[in-house]
Amino acid sequence: MAKISFNDISFTYEGSEAETIKGFQLAIEDGEILSLLGKSGSGKTTLLKIMAGLLSPQKGRLCFDNEDVTQLTAKKRDIAQVFQFPVLYDSMNVEDNVKFPLRIKKLPEIEVLKRFERVCSLLELDPILKSKSKDLSLYQRQIVSIARAFVRPNLKAVFLDEPLTALSPKLKWQLRKKIKTLQREDRVTMVFVTHDQTEALSFADRVGIIDAGTLVQLDEPKTIYERPLTTFVGDFIGNPGMNFLPVEAFFSKHDSRKKASKVGFRAEWAELAEVGEGRLSGKVVGFEADRTRDHQPYGTTYIHSNFGQMRVRGAYQRLVGKTVSVRLTSHLFFDSNDTLINEDG
């Protein structure tokens, strides 16, 4: 286990004039699961490679437990990596693949067997131990690569780069559960890179939102969702993202809330009402169902108002083309810099 600290780290790829990572500061707690979440090209995989020793920053220090490891090679960092597409030895069977990291450490056979049996039991690998890696499904190959990661002795951290992307939703859920069981057993520090919000918010102890090589918010998943620090985070997180309307949609120009520029609210913080029963109003222009609830279509109603489009979550109602009011149960204020301010504006 290790506490991992980024201290003012910057990185630029050769041939590029723009910094990919810019003065990055982050402390990852010993034994926690941290998800780095961001759009493609935001810099999250670059950060993972810096932690793993695959890239060296031009500026700053990376520390494991206050020890500067910035210039240490990957082999000397006592870490393991799991990638989107598993890297296995196809000529070996599953048992030999899992034992390989232990054999190259020249551990006593009794120690090899002990660690091997433990990880195989937790990941339920027994039925495929004698199978050749080349004959496995993608899901099975990924489980084996995870076993290879966690079987290592003196493991300080595990880094996962989009390990579930190519799997079906059901298999993703199964594999997330297995990974979390292993991590909780070992209390190993884990960093999980993804662009999938569901993975990040359901899997991690904390989530770091990365945008253009900077950390824009670091919080527990519930806080990330309910109190985004910027309109970028509010829009990026959630399906659909947060609604944003100018503050004038709610209050007169002479209202005391002069600092507020925008009002933000989640689609589930709003409900449809009869005209005149809500502060907002607009014309229903569409409905998109994504599930059923109580045998009724449930999804997002799209409403066009004079101040912009609104999205409201709820059961289907035959309202397309009609004017409705929207009533809010909660909302947030943002300033002219798109930054969250207090509820009083």
Would you name each region that the model predicts?
Residues 6-9, 17-29, 60:
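Conserved beta-strand
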Residues 253-345:
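Non-catalytic connector elements of ABC transporters
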